[in-house]
Curated annotation (Swiss-Prot):
Pfam families per record: GTP1_OBG (PF01018), MMR_HSR1 (PF01926)
InterPro entries named in the record: G_OBG, GTP-bd, GTP-bd_Obg/CgtA, GTP1_OBG_dom, GTP1_OBG_dom_sf, OBG_GTPase, P-loop_NTPase
Species this chain originates from: Homo sapiens (Human)
Top-level lineage group: Eukaryota
GO biological process: ribosome biogenesis
Keyword Magnesium: no
Keyword Nucleus: yes
Residues annotated as binding GTP: 155-162, 202-206, 278-281
Protein keywords: Chromosome, GTP-binding, Nucleotide-binding, Nucleus, Ribosome biogenesis
Annotated family: Belongs to the TRAFAC class OBG-HflX-like GTPase superfamily. OBG GTPase family.
CDD domains: Obg
Protein name stated in the entry: GTP-binding protein 10
């Protein structure tokens, strides 16, 4: 019988993926009642995505976290129409979700130069406002970063995710022979000979209870949401966080990881998934791998070994299972090819689904137009033709 265990964990590093900001649009300019002049509109506040920006840089650059746009120019004899106040642009990284104080989503920034209006400037003084300017909009906004990647690495600490990322890409994450080496998400890119690029996100190792925010689980589980596919990375020799916690076999780690994803957000289980069985250079690795494969072929035959609350509603069906060694390089090329093949298949399926949807919409549109009753003009014309 597999039992649950709990343990205290040290705090993660100073990686920032959430910020709360105060924003205010600029006030409008004064109107000129005697000549009917209109004051300029206050500047607006925008959130703009930039590729090489981080929330930590934003916080360091603007420690007060207050962003106020410029005031509109007053109307005057030499310029009856006042000019608009200067807009304020807040630089943020790509992958930001912007919400208001009530949690309502204002918008998302998924590529460079995407921009969202978060606070409008006030109107300038004009006849409708008795030539008095209006104040700009005040708004508290929350920036929530979710990394965007093709593949997200999922695994317990010390499974070799960082070593794997350094093998398949040019990323240089911190690597050491102890748990929790990775303290913040890392992004790398797999480069192929035909210049195809696939982005991979290495997340800090999950732990049992991550769905309840143990080990800051929510802080890093959310980054999996925007990955197209998941790559489970498990240690063939199993995992034990410390001498005070229970040892887990490779099969048990897969089941427990699946359960953590399910409890955090069920939709994550619907993502296409691959499995990399790491550390195949260790003694007895081949025997353990054959045992793991037999367990994965019929997982339901072994679920009775787990406590009921640890069994996921559905087990993950891996598209590819690849034995690898991030130390010797064994299986790395095969893994890279499987990742690309899986993503290409997913893209083809999405394109086919989109094409079918477009054809269905076209057919519905044609059907509706053919069943519409003829217009009065059409009926009158036909009678005249008969006469």
């Amino acid at each position: 019988m597999v039992h649950c265990s709990c343990v205290l964990f040290r705090k993660y590093g100073n990686f920032i993926d959430k910020l709360r900001l105060f924003t205010r649009g600029g006030s409008g300019g004064m109107g000129y009642p005697r000549l009917g002049g209109e004051g300029g509109k206050g500047g607006d506040v925008w959130v703009v995505a930039q590729n090489r920006m981080t929330l930590k840089q934003l916080k360091d650059r603007y420690p007060r976290k207050r962003f106020v746009a410029g005031v509109g120019a007053n109307s005057k004899i030499s310029a009856l129409k006042g000019s608009k106040g200067k807009d304020c642009e807040i630089p943020v990284p790509v992958g930001i979700s912007v919400t208001d104080e009530n949690g309502k989503i204002i918008g998302e920034l998924n590529k460079e130069n995407d921009r969202i209006l978060v606070a409008q400037g006030g109107l300038g003084g004009k006849l409708l406002t008795n030539f008095l300017p209006l104040k700009g909009q005040k708004r508290i906004i929350h920036l929530d970063l979710k990394l965007i990647a093709d593949v997200g690495l999922v695994g317990f600490p010390n499974a070799g995710k960082s070593s794997l990322l350094s093998c398949v890409s040019h990323a240089k994450p911190a690597i050491a022979d102890y748990a929790f080496t990775t303290l913040k998400p890392e992004l790398g890119k797999i480069m192929y000979s035909d210049f195809k690029q696939i982005s991979v996100a290495d997340l800090p190792g999950l732990i049992e209870g991550a769905h309840m925010n143990k080990g800051m689980g929510h802080k890093f589980l959310k980054h999996i949401e925007r990955t197209r596919q998941l790559l489970f990375v498990v240690d063939i020799s199993g995992f034990q966080l410390s001498s005070h916690t229970q040892y887990r076999t490779a099969f048990e780690t897969i089941i427990l990881l699946t359960k953590e994803l399910e409890l955090y957000k069920e939709e994550l289980q619907t993502k296409p998934a691959l499995l990399a069985v790491n550390k195949m250079d260790l003694p007895d690795a081949q025997d353990k791998f054959h045992e793991l494969m037999s367990q994965l072929q019929n997982p339901k035959d072994f679920l009775h070994l787990f406590e009921k609350n640890m069994i996921p509603e559905r087990t993950v069906e891996f598209q590819h299972i690849i034995p690898i060694s991030a130390v010797t390089g064994e299986g790395i090329e095969e893994l890279k090819n499987c990742i690309r093949k899986s993503l290409d298949e997913q893209a083809n399926q999405e394109n086919d689904a989109l094409h079918k949807k477009q054809l269905l919409n076209l057919w519905i549109s044609d059907t509706m137009s053919s069943t519409e009753p003829p217009s009065k003009h059409a009926v009158t014309t036909s009678k005249m033709d008969i006469i």
